[in-house]
């Protein structure tokens, strides 16, 4: 594992503790992409630390969380927020959030790394594309695009189910995915190594083509 900044090591400790305390938690967002990437040889070099953590939570575990943490509602984004030590956590509750993939689906297919549940690649792709659509013109949008690329690279080396990936994929998600695959972030991730960037793009494009073959825009909502 690459050397980590001490702040991020502490965040990972808090993530592990939250995951241990609440049965209904599954991590999403950048922290989930990191845990997938760092645990696979093909993508570990591209794993990127994050400053906060997002998770989906069941209603029963949300009640337990309220008893321990001081949650601040964010009705505009349909989530709750809290601080644990110095770190920010965004909480998306079952049947209360507007995330495109239902909680039950995400939890049913979640995978674990060292006891921490994270969304499967197929669900994480759609959740990340939702963020990428909303923030594509910002610096956050660039990070979203890189996370989408990491997911595609992971999908190249894993049993990626394209049919599951498109089940909740909207036309805007698919369009943004195409822009990302054709975009410039591969060069940035490869730190200017044109040969590596080309290989990464080819591998990501293979997974995109699998998705494109089964995606039906008529079923998009």
For the regions a protein language model found, what residue spans apply to each?
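Compositionally biased terminal segments of proteins
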Residues: 1-221
């Amino acid at each position: 594992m690459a050397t980590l900044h001490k702040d991020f090591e502490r965040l990972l400790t808090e993530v592990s503790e939250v995951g241990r305390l609440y049965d209904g938690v599954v991590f999403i967002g950048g922290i989930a992409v990191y845990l997938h990437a760092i645990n696979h040889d093909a993508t570990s070099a591209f794993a990127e630390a994050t400053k906060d953590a997002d998770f989906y939570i069941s209603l029963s575990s949300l009640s337990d969380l309220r008893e321990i943490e001081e949650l601040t509602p964010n009705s505009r984004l349909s989530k709750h927020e809290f601080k644990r030590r110095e770190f920010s956590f965004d909480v998306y509750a079952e049947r209360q959030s507007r995330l495109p993939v239902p909680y039950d689906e995400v939890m049913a297919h979640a995978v674990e790394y060292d006891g921490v549940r994270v969304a499967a690649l197929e669900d994480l792709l759609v959740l990340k594309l939702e963020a990428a659509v909303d923030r594509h013109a910002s610096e956050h949008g660039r990070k979203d695009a890189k996370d989408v690329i990491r997911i595609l690279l992971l999908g190249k080396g894993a049993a990626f189910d394209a049919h599951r990936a498109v089940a909740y994929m909207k036309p805007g998600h698919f369009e943004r995915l195409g822009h990302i695959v054709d975009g410039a972030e591969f060069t940035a991730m490869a730190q200017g190594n044109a040969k590596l960037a080309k290989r990464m793009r080819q591998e990501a494009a293979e997974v995109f083509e699998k998705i494109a073959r089964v995606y039906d825009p008529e079923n998009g909502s």
